[in-house]
Amino acid sequence: MLRMLLSYLKRLIYKESVAIKIKTPEQIEGIRLSSQLAAKTLKYIEPFVKPGVTTLELDTLIEKFVKDNGATSATKGYRGYKHASCISPNEVVCHGVPNQYVLKDGDILNIDVTTILNGYFGDTCKMYYVGIPSDYAKKLVETTKECLRLGMEECKPGAHLGDIGAAISEHAHANGYSVVYEFCGHGVGLKFHEEPDVQHIAKRGTGPVLKQGMIFTIEPMINAGKARCKIDRRDGWTARTIDDKLSAQFEHTILITEDGFEALTDVYGDF
């Protein structure tokens, strides 16, 4: 318990000396195109998310769509991961391994896709309703979407990275939810994971100052119950809530612009 507490406290205060790469205009355009493809992949798969379909079937469709559009999946082969996406139903917080789980009416589902197009990375995820969700599940999903929006609204030159996590955690806690602190957002674009870590629970005024040309993900994971996670020992990836209560997540790849931000993966304006 003490170790968990120390881990939590470390996430409240950022190191100020993190080296964050500023992308060039050429790099930004490449990352933008890859990010748009990632968003289009999530849109493509939407009609297939329905009762009776397995998460492995969804992953197979995603892999083909990405390949047909001249890209590859960053997750496939990453540290031995075997699939083109992470698909996380219900109590799965993140990194859900596609398998023979059959979707059923009332499930909530997160699909996370990272594309590599011409060497550039774009990363996004969103929630889907399988059939008709319960009011309990819908409130969690909609609050998580609001958390992402509030985090993005903090993004502008001169703001601190910690302002993002503060906005997210304030809204989640006000609605009776917890914020996962064992996983976070990250720099992205030239690599799958770059500096900085983007914590979703943090103190305002802490962390590096945001500058034009920075690109990173914001991807809050909000739990209906406790914040802690447990890793499935059978696959080494799937992270579930410690109490098996529902979890939800949304993610955009964010570019800091001259006077604010651009969500590079926001092609359709649906979250």
Kindly give the residue locations of the regions a language model identified:
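Active-site neighborhoods and metal-handling regions in enzymes and metal-associated proteins
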Residues: 2-271
